[in-house]
């Protein structure tokens, strides 16, 4: 088995494949997230959000998805786009959430697949987790130093905001994790 690709190589591959940010987190259990999800679920504070609260033990422990996992390579893909022009015909128009206008997870997957391929080519295992409740993406992104938790509970990426979809490559390649970013929020 070769040495794992360098962090700078991983970031370069991700960014050249369309990702907007790439960071590394360790594969430890997200203990505080597990406690928060379990507490909210037991108090009925999940408002029927079964996707998020279905299996907190699984979604906060990367090693349940990949037992030999040592590192998470977390990617973010922006879905921000400028406002569309308003209809000039006077016809009714609708509003659709930005993230629902196209398959942004598909673009995220392309970037993460390019990273996974590089790892596999070097002899390492890689598993991609995107939008399937197998991992709490926001906590992975926070731990990977991609952004911080904003007052809206979303991950805020410096100078970019919260208009991102998130996903991870789990791997048995060991990397030094990035440090989480300090809270950059003001008093909005």
Walk through the language-model features, giving the residues of each.
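Auxiliary alpha/beta "docking" domains used to position bulky ligands
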Residues: 1-187
């Amino acid at each position: 088995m070769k040495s794992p690709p360098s962090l700078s190589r991983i970031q370069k591959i991700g960014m050249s494949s369309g990702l907007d940010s790439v960071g590394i987190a360790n594969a430890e259990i997200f203990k505080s997230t597990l406690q928060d999800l379990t507490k909210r679920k037991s108090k009925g504070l999940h408002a029927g959000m079964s996707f998020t609260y279905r299996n907190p033990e699984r979604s906060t422990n990367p090693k349940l998805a990949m037992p030999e996992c040592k590192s998470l390579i977390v990617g973010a893909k922006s879905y921000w786009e400028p406002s569309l022009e308003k209809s000039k015909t006077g016809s009714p128009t609708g509003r659709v959430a930005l993230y629902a206008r196209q398959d942004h997870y598909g673009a995220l997957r392309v970037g993460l697949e390019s990273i996974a391929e590089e790892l596999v080519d070097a002899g390492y295992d890689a598993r991609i987790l995107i939008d399937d409740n197998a991992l709490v993406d926001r906590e992975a992104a926070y731990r990977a130093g991609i952004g911080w938790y904003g007052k809206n509970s979303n991950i805020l990426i410096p100078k970019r905001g919260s208009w991102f979809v998130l996903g991870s490559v789990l791997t048995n390649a060991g990397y030094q994790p990035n440090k989480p970013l300090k809270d950059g929020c003001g008093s909005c």
